[in-house]
Amino acid sequence: MKALVLGLLRVYRYAISPMLGRNCRFHPCCSEYAQEAVERHGAMRGGWLALKRVGRCHPFHPGGYDPVP
């Protein structure tokens, strides 16, 4: 499961993300955060952390440095 999620993230980061441009308000960007969260915590918990992060990534949030716990 973990390998599948990481593979999907890599496809997004290298095939889709360059076409969309860098729009993330955080550092590291949301896809880097998701990859690190899944590597550290596994597919379930890391995926949940990534979803929470993407939910915070909007124009009304100040953004900034937000490392993976």
UniProtKB/Swiss-Prot annotation:
It holds the Pfam family YidD. It comes from the Bacteria. One of its GO terms (cellular component) is plasma membrane. It is a peripheral membrane protein. It is found in: Cell inner membrane. Keywords: Cell inner membrane, Cell membrane, Membrane. NCBIfam families: membrane protein insertion efficiency factor YidD (TIGR00278). Belongs to the UPF0161 family. PANTHER family: MEMBRANE PROTEIN INSERTION EFFICIENCY FACTOR-RELATED. Could be involved in insertion of integral membrane proteins into the membrane. This is Putative membrane protein insertion efficiency factor.
